[in-house]
């Protein structure tokens, strides 16, 4: 079974195209018009081994908010679509990712219940052309689009770039494990209620 999805999300604010393969090799092509954001998505795809093409044309003349939010929603929807009925997936996972002095942890449940618990903070308002407050919003929007419960925490760190990168790498590693097929589940949906 191929776990591939394509999403096209178009509004008056953005035009988002996503094509992904959950069972890829970490190949990606990301073009959002926001350099630092592209760098974070590069980390996500490389370390999750998800193949993904992302193209976003957004109203950057206003600010990056809509571009980041709509990209996260569409990417989440693509993950959810590619997972199908979620039969046989591992479902739960967590991962730590260090980036020099920064260490972050992400725990994930592919539950169908979108929720974000966020414990990370930044000491500067921008990283390149990205408002740091948008990082929490990206994780929330991604969780909503994908139907994930995410617990995201930076345990420590000083450099804001390193903190952000450790967050996306931790998500990548946790997502890679959670979407993996567990042969021991013999194709069953990993829930006592029979659906996710």
Curated annotation (Swiss-Prot):
Annotated Pfam families: IGPD
Pathway per the UniProt entry: Amino-acid biosynthesis; L-histidine biosynthesis; L-histidine from 5-phospho-alpha-D-ribose 1-diphosphate: step 6/9
Main location: cytoplasm
Any one cellular-component term (Gene Ontology): cytoplasm
Gene designation per UniProt: hisB
Database matches in InterPro entries: IGPD_sf, ImidazoleglycerolP_deHydtase, ImidazoleglycerP_deHydtase_CS, Ribosomal_Su5_D2-typ_SF
Name listed for the protein in its UniProt record: Imidazoleglycerol-phosphate dehydratase
A biological process from GO: L-histidine biosynthetic process
UniProt xrefs under NCBIfam families: PRK00951.1-5 (NF002109), PRK00951.2-1 (NF002111), PRK00951.2-4 (NF002114)
Keyword Membrane: no
Family: Belongs to the imidazoleglycerol-phosphate dehydratase family.
PANTHER family noted in UniProt: IMIDAZOLEGLYCEROL-PHOSPHATE DEHYDRATASE, IMIDAZOLEGLYCEROL-PHOSPHATE DEHYDRATASE HIS7
Enzyme class: lyase
Localization (cell): Cytoplasm
UniProt keyword annotations, A-Z: Amino-acid biosynthesis, Cytoplasm, Histidine biosynthesis, Lyase
């Amino acid at each position: 079974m191929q776990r591939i999805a394509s999403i096209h999300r178009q509004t008056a604010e953005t035009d988002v195209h996503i094509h992904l393969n959950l069972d890829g090799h970490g190949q990606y092509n990301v073009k959002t018009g926001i350099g630092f954001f592209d760098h974070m998505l590069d980390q996500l795809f490389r370390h999750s081994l998800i193949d993904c093409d992302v193209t976003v044309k957004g109203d950057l003349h206003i600010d990056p908010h809509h571009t980041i939010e709509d990209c996260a929603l569409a990417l989440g929807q693509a993950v959810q679509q590619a997972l199908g009925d979620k039969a046989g997936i591992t479902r739960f996972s967590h991962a730590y990712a260090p980036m020099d002095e920064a260490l972050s942890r992400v725990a994930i449940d592919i539950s169908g219940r979108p929720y974000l618990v966020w414990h990370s903070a930044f000491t500067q308002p921008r990283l390149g052309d990205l408002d740091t407050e948008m990082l929490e919003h990206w994780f929330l929007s991604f969780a909503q689009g994908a139907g994930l419960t995410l617990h995201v925490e930076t345990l420590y760190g000083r450099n804001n770039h390193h903190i952000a990168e450790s967050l996306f790498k931790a998500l990548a590693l946790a997502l890679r494990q959670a979407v993996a097929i567990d042969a021991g589940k013999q194709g069953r949906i990993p829930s006592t209620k029979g659906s996710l």
